[in-house]
From Swiss-Prot:
GO terms for molecular function: rRNA binding; structural constituent of ribosome; tRNA binding. Belongs to the universal ribosomal protein uS13 family. SUPFAM superfamilies: S13-like H2TH domain. This is Small ribosomal subunit protein uS13. GO terms for biological process: translation. Part of the 30S ribosomal subunit. Forms a loose heterodimer with protein S19. Forms two bridges to the 50S subunit in the 70S ribosome. Residues 91-118 are annotated as: Disordered. Transmembrane segments: none annotated. GO terms for cellular component: cytosol; small ribosomal subunit. The keyword Translocase does not apply. It comes from Methylococcus capsulatus (strain ATCC 33009 / NCIMB 11132 / Bath).
Length: 118
């Protein structure tokens, strides 16, 4: 099992799919990484040589992925909350941020219903 960006990527899958196991890399970016590293996307990870895995590591290192990306996203949300912007207030209150309706639905963001006490 190859280890790239601190993640064990599955070796029984194609390189394109295996790279998506890394947080911050989707199929499009995985394809771009394979192209820049000069590796066919339909090759399985276990078929790659050590030199090819090193080239993949070098290409992945050019992007912000895993812990750094998670930290960056968390800091962006914290910044919005500290500014007191509308989006920050919605994050703080645990409500939908992107304009969805809340009169009905939005249960995922709001959590389970609380009964009204009389």
């Amino acid at each position: 099992m190859a280890r790239i960006a601190g993640v064990n990527i599955p070796d029984h899958k194609h390189v394109l799919i295996s790279l998506t196991a890394i947080y911050g890399i989707g199929r499009t970016r995985a394809g771009l990484i394979c192209k820049n590293a000069g590796i066919e996307t339909d090759k399985k990870v276990r078929e790659l040589s050590d030199e090819q895995v090193e080239r993949l590591r070098g290409e992945v290192a050019k992007f912000v992925v895993e812990g750094d990306l998670r930290r960056e996203v968390a800091m962006n949300i914290k910044r919005l909350m500290d500014l007191g912007s509308y989006r920050g207030m919605r994050h703080r209150r645990g409500l939908p941020v992107r304009g969805q309706r809340t009169r009905t639905n939005a249960r995922t963001r709001k959590g389970p219903r609380r009964p009204i006490k009389k």
